[in-house]
């Protein structure tokens, strides 16, 4: 559509990786062993490692976005989070927020928005009707469940609190993809041992089993390109993904301008 050709719109969804400290309340769940040549030996895990782990595992891992030890994603489905900011806008805000030591990263996987919509990704819902009550109950594994008269359970993964002047995440232009598979064994293993059993049982969007094409990678440095390209080519040689799954790699430092 001609009306969609605008500088503030994008045909892509961006999932970025940030540095993570496993000993904080904003952690992620990773198994002790993530497969051959994918070992992390410290509680601090850098964004480049997480990008390469996702590529080598052909999976973007789902989570409930823990903050201070509490889930921030409502409902019972873990999600993969994206922004639909145009790539140029993401690069600009990413550089500025990193300068302020905010939680963002310049390592990212870029997926075509229309294809991801067909796989179930949806824009989040910022706030509810003023007559609906957003109070929630807590489930066995820490789920935050809203009253279904306010929002059906199947849609609750999309809800993001919005209180003008106090809580405003609308600048993130967030989309989410919900994992709809069975997660009981995953949750039980975490409850008993504190970590997932293995990388295969960790929920996420598996681009091996999808027909995604035209995806891309963003890295901050040109020196990152050979290693990331190696990971992608290895997947192609193994027959895990197709030749057209990934089409580009952007190194931020090589761009003369993104405005």
Model-identified regions with their sequence ranges:
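NAD-dependent ADP-ribosyltransferases
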Residues: 1-259
